[in-house]
Amino acid sequence: MTVPCIPRGLVMADIAAFRLTEEEKQRLLDPAVGGVILFRRNFQNIAQLKELTAEIKALRTPELIIAVDHEGGRVQRFIEGFTRLPAMSTLGEIWDKDGASAAETAAGQVGRVLATELSACGIDLSFTPVLDLDWGNCPVIGNRSFHRNPEAVARLALALQKGLEKGGMKSCGKHFPGHGFVEGDSHLVLPEDGRSLSELEAADLAPFRIMSREGMAAVMPAHVVYPQVDTKPAGFSEIWLKQILRRDIGFKGVIFSDDLTMEGACGAGGIKERARISFEAGCDIVLVCNRPDLVDELREDFRIPDNPALAQRWQYMANTLGSAAAQAVMQTTDFQAAQAFVAGLASPQDTAGGVKVGEAF
C-alpha cells in the first residue's frame, strides 16, 4: 500500500488506548494533524508500545512526530520495563549536598537514560525539562522543579539536555515564563502571577534565557496570567511569545501550546478560538488532548494559518538516534551502568502528590 505524503499540520492530538482504531487512523491522516502525544493509558508493555508507535509512523510520510510527558518522578507515563526516573528535585538536592559538578553529571545520565529508552520504543520527544523555579507555592510543579535557584535550574536543565541529545532527543523547556510561583493548577483553574516583568526577569525567566542561548529546541508556555505584563495567559499572549520570547530572548525554536483543553485555556472561547488565538500569539503547534471531538471540530472548517517555518520546525523535533540504534545502545555495559545509577536516584518520595499530573486514564 502506498503511504500518503501529507505535510505535518499544526495540531498534536492523542489516542484512546493501546492500538489505533479506524476512526483514529482517519483523524491522524488529516492534514491538520502533525503529531501524537501518548499517555499512560496508551501503554501496556514495551512490545505493545513499539507496535503502536510503528503503526502511527506507518500512516503517512513524513512520519507523525510522537511525544510524551516523561519527566521523571510523578510525571513518568511509562513504568513497566523502563528505568524509574527520579523527580528533578532529587538533582537539586544533589546540587545542594554534593555540589554542581556531581548534580550536572547525574542530570546528564538521567537525560541519556530517559531519551534512549524512549527512542528505542519509537518516541521522538519528551516534553522536558521543567524550567519552573520551586518557590514552594505550586503543588502541581513541586518536585518536578530542579531547584529554586535560577542558576541551578539552568545548569541542571542544560546537563539534562546534553543527555537527551545523546539519546536522540531534543529538549522542550516549560512552562514559560514560569509556573512555580502561583498556587493554582492550570489543569483546573487559570492562575495569576502578580509579579512585575522585572521581578520575573530577575528569577523565573533566567533559565529560559540561558537555555535558549544553549540550543533549547522547543518551549511550552504556561496557561498562567501575568497581569502586570499582559491580561492574556502567556500561551495566548503576543507580548510573551512574540515580543519577549522571540524578540527579546531570541528564541528560534518551536513553540508548542500547552493542552488547549485545560481549564486555564478554556476562558479564551471554543476550541477554534483557542487555536486561533494561540497561533496569532506565536505558537507553532497546539496540543488538543483527551477530546477527540475537539480535534474533529478543528479539522472540519477551521482555517489553519500559514506557517512557512512549520515543516522545518517539526523535522527538528524528530528523533535523531532511531529505534534500532537506541536498542543497540541499551545492550552496552556502559548504558546499563547508567540505568542502574539513575534507578538508584529514584525513591518513593518522587511520586508524592500522585502521578496524575495532566493525565487522563
From Swiss-Prot:
One of its GO terms (cellular component) is cytoplasm. The keyword Hydrolase applies. It is found in: Cytoplasm. Pathway: Cell wall biogenesis; peptidoglycan recycling. InterPro entries: Beta_hexosaminidase_bac, Glyco_hydro_3_AS, Glyco_hydro_3_N, Glyco_hydro_3_N_sf, Glycoside_hydrolase_SF, NagZ_Beta-hexosaminidase. GO terms for biological process: carbohydrate metabolic process; cell division; cell wall organization; peptidoglycan biosynthetic process; peptidoglycan turnover; regulation of cell shape. Plays a role in peptidoglycan recycling by cleaving the terminal beta-1,4-linked N-acetylglucosamine (GlcNAc) from peptide-linked peptidoglycan fragments, giving rise to free GlcNAc, anhydro-N-acetylmuramic acid and anhydro-N-acetylmuramic acid-linked peptides. This is Beta-hexosaminidase. The gene is nagZ. Coiled coil: none annotated. The record marks D185 as: Important for catalytic activity. Belongs to the glycosyl hydrolase 3 family. NagZ subfamily. Keywords: Cell cycle, Cell division, Cell shape, Cell wall biogenesis/degradation, Cytoplasm, Glycosidase, Hydrolase, Peptidoglycan synthesis. It catalyses: Hydrolysis of terminal non-reducing N-acetyl-D-hexosamine residues in N-acetyl-beta-D-hexosaminides. Substrate binds at D69, R77, R144, K174, H175. Its EC number is 3.2.1.52. The active site is at H187 (proton donor/acceptor), D258 (nucleophile). The keyword Cell wall biogenesis/degradation applies. Pfam families: Glyco_hydro_3 (PF00933). GO terms for molecular function: beta-N-acetylhexosaminidase activity. Gene3D superfamilies: Glycoside hydrolase, family 3, N-terminal domain (3.20.20.300).
